[in-house]
């Protein structure tokens, strides 16, 4: 049994710079009377993963040195460190996503973890899933901010985006996607599932990577993305003049002025089900 426990230390937010992860394994007894024990009554081995706990960003290491974490310091001697998962700070998939993909038996090639295909399985009846071999991606509404030297993602996903606003924008955009062989399905406000062959081998960056950073390192090439770059440009023009964004700006909210594709890919075989293997749980 593998449990990926996600927790942030203090108020550090080094999300985009996170390059490596240390995984710790617990082989002891978990008191069933505790909140953690109630989640895992069988007391199987547990792995603890703490995303965003450190980064190469300036000031991070001095900040970590001064942190007082008595509970974590008590816990670490009880755990066994596993091999370090090293990576580049500009990798497309953050380390905690790579670790979870490995635990689930999913492909974990950088930028090609098929998270959207996994999510599509969960909603197979609602979206009339025909085959596990379809290619999927997440489409997330976001706000891009242009400066003199770069374009960065200021907000992803969009905050306070109502379900009705998301549905209205989806209805406006869906016909344009369909012209390019892509079908959109609502998932959450501002976050949709997209099905289309263009996503089969499209490398995409996690929203965790691009939040607050320049888009340049993670923009797919024209060769990789095909008509998607043109489609995104068309959708930006549509969003620029859409009444939903006029209403958002009138109430002081950021407009949704762009899209971000992520989690693209295909499940490795027809028989893979979620979760795989059994016992993987995220808390």
Language-model-detected regions and their locations in the chain:
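Extreme N-terminal basic, low-complexity initiation segments
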Residues: 2-15
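…; additionally, a secondary subgroup of soluble metalloenzymes is captured
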Residues: 18-283
């Amino acid at each position: 049994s593998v449990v990926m426990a996600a927790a942030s230390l203090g108020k550090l937010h080094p999300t985009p710079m996170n390059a490596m992860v240390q995984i710790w394994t617990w082989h002891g007894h978990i008191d069933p009377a505790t909140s953690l024990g109630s989640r895992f009554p069988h007391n199987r081995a547990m792995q603890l993963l703490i995303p965003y706990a450190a980064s190469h960003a300036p000031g991070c290491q001095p900040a970590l040195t001064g942190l007082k974490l008595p509970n974590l310091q008590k816990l670490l001697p009880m755990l066994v460190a596993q091999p370090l998962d090293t990576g580049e700070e500009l990798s497309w998939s953050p380390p905690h996503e790579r670790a979870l993909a490995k635990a689930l038996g999913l492909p974990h090639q950088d930028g090609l973890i098929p998270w959207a295909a996994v999510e599509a399985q969960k909603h197979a009846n609602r979206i009339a899933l025909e085959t596990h071999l379809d290619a999927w991606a997440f489409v997330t509404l976001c706000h891009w901010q242009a400066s003199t030297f770069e374009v960065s993602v200021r907000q992803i996903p969009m905050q306070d985006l109502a379900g009705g606003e998301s549905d209205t924008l989806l209805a406006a955009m869906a016909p344009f996607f369909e012209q390019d062989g892509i079908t959109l399905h609502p998932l959450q406000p501002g976050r949709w599932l997209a099905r289309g062959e263009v996503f089969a081998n499209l490398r995409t960056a996690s929203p965790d990577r691009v939040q607050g950073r320049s888009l340049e390192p993670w923009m797919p090439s024209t060769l990789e993305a095909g008509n998607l770059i043109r489609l995104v440009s068309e959708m930006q023009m549509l969003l620029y003049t859409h009444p939903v964004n006029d209403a958002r700006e009138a109430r002081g909210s950021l407009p949704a002025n762009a899209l971000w594709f992520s989690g693209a890919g295909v499940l490795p075989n027809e028989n893979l089900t979620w979760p795989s293997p059994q016992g993987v749980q995220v808390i």
